[in-house]
Amino acid sequence: YVNKYSNLIVCRTFSKAYGLAGCRVGFLAANKDLAQRLYNLRPMYEINSLGVMIVNEILKKNTFIIKNLKEQLRGKKYLLKELKKLKLQYLDGHANFIHINLGEKKSKLEKIFYKNNILIRGGLNISGYKNFLRISLGPENMMKRVVKILKSFLK
């Protein structure tokens, strides 16, 4: 698509799917002319040498990346299926997390997750979404832990 549209820039990060959040490494794709103009605007200090070394190693191990992404997708599929069974409203998307509406039980459940070493985020600070929890997706075995706690709590 980037060669088809002269004004399209696709930006990606290695942070989530590759497990490199601390490296702050990303990349972009654009047609040659646009990429050159963007290259001229780059900051003085781009990526550090450690980030370069880590990304090079990760890219060499493409099978690991694909396996990890497939495991995450299986975990997501499992979690969404279980949330439907529990009749919990959720916001799905293409990110590595979902938001689950827990109503007034949100605060209590946050504490229970914390006690069980499952770290989650409070959710959306937007009117109408205050009772949503943000849960990061992971492999199915991790999502089973989340579902077990949800089921136990909602009994």
Regions found by a protein language model. Give the residues of each.
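Short acidic/glycine-enriched loop/turn segments that link adjacent beta-strands
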Residues: 22, 94, 127-131
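Short hydrophobic/aromatic beta-strand micro-patches
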Residues: 29, 99-103, 136-138
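Hydrophobic side chains in well-ordered alpha-helices
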Residues: 38, 109, 146-149
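PLP-dependent aminotransferase class I/II
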Residues: 7-84, 88-91
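PLP-dependent enzyme catalytic core of the Aspartate aminotransferase-like
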Residues: 115-116, 125-155
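Conserved PLP-binding catalytic core of the aspartate aminotransferase-like
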Residues: 72-73, 77, 82-116
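Short, conserved loop/helix-junction motifs that constitute active-site signature segments
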Residues: 1-5
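Active-site catalytic microenvironments in core metabolic enzymes, especially phosphate/sugar-handling
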Residues: 121
